[in-house]
């Protein structure tokens, strides 16, 4: 009887202590643009690249200063792609802290500063410890540095927060 009560108590405690996955904040002036952006992320995660590209572009037609859509969006025109990234960088300080960090991670990567990227990914996790996305980003940066054991731990933490994190599961499978 005591074992059953202990087991039930443990289940109740673990159910009550479940961490809610908090998405990284995204700033846009328009709800429809946000919906296109979210749709683009789903398309890209499923390998539907043309649909993802179109959804990012739809978001940018509605809100041309949408930082994350500018950071992640692309076209077949490299000049336009550069303009997207420049717009993201120019507007990063008007966006959320998470968006600023993500843009700075991209900038550091473009400049070949992998240590800075890792430092920024750790900052993202410190500021957003309940976000599976933050742990996936950290895992990606650790993997980039060939620190595979730590990257696996980061992906596992993302899965602990969100057992349905496609990006974390996909990264672990690589």
Where are these regions (language model features)?
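Short coil turns that delineate tetratricopeptide repeat
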Residues: 30-31, 64, 93-96, 129-130, ...
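Helix-start (N-cap) detector for alpha-helical repeat units in TPR-like alpha-solenoids
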Residues: 26, 33-34, 67-68, 98, ...
């Amino acid at each position: 009887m005591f074992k059953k009560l202990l087991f039930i108590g443990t289940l109740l405690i673990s159910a009550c202590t479940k961490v809610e996955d908090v998405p990284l904040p995204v700033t846009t002036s328009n709800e429809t643009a946000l919906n296109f952006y979210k749709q683009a992320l789903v398309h890209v995660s499923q390998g539907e690249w043309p649909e993802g590209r179109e959804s990012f572009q739809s978001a940018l037609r509605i809100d041309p200063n949408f930082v994350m859509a500018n950071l992640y969006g692309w076209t077949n025109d490299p000049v336009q792609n550069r303009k997207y990234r420049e717009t993201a960088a120019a507007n990063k300080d008007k966006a959320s802290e998470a968006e600023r960090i993500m843009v700075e991670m991209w900038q550091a990567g473009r400049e070949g500063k992998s240590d800075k990227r890792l430092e920024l990914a750790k900052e993202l996790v410190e500021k957003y410890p309940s976000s599976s996305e933050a742990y996936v980003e950290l895992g990606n940066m650790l993997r980039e540095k060939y620190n595979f054991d730590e990257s696996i731990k980061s992906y596992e933490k993302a899965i602990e927060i969100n057992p349905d994190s496609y990006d974390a599961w996909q990264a672990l499978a690589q």
